[in-house]
């Protein structure tokens, strides 16, 4: 289930212009229990579908700590991958997004890295905060 939302006091805010690294505020309170998506900018290009290969910039924050874990913007290199090869939260939360768009994804643990976590700043049962800029649908 995907909850699309436009605003919630518990969700982090995202700021910054298109084409640059977003700034994400620290989350407040308990995370949503379902996948939540919010379009920060709606793109006008080609639409991503479940079978798409994508070129994106992304920023990842851990909900429990509010710590920025990683960002492709820091290296200046986009990430390219088939949507079918990433975590379920992306597989469910990215389709429908269009090139040029920026989307906030709040991904519960069962659609992320689950009870095992991913090591480092992504511990067990971590809710993930992603801001995804869809550069290209390949």
For every predicted segment, state its role:
Residues 1-138:
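Cross-family detector of peptidyl-prolyl cis-trans isomerase
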């Amino acid at each position: 289930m995907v909850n699309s939302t436009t605003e919630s006091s518990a969700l982090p805010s995202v700021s910054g212009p298109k084409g640059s690294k977003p700034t994400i505020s620290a989350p407040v309170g308990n995370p949503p229990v379902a996948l939540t998506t919010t379009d920060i900018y709606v793109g006008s290009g080609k639409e991503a579908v479940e079978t798409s290969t994508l070129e994106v910039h992304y920023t990842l924050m851990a909900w429990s700590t509010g710590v920025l874990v990683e960002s492709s913007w820091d290296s200046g290199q986009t990430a390219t991958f088939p949507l079918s090869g990433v975590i379920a939260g992306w597989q469910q939360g990215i389709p429908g997004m269009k090139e040029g768009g920026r989307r906030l994804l709040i991904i519960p643990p069962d659609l992320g890295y689950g009870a095992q976590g991913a090591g480092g700043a992504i511990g067990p049962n971590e809710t993930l905060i992603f801001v995804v800029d869809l550069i290209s649908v390949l």
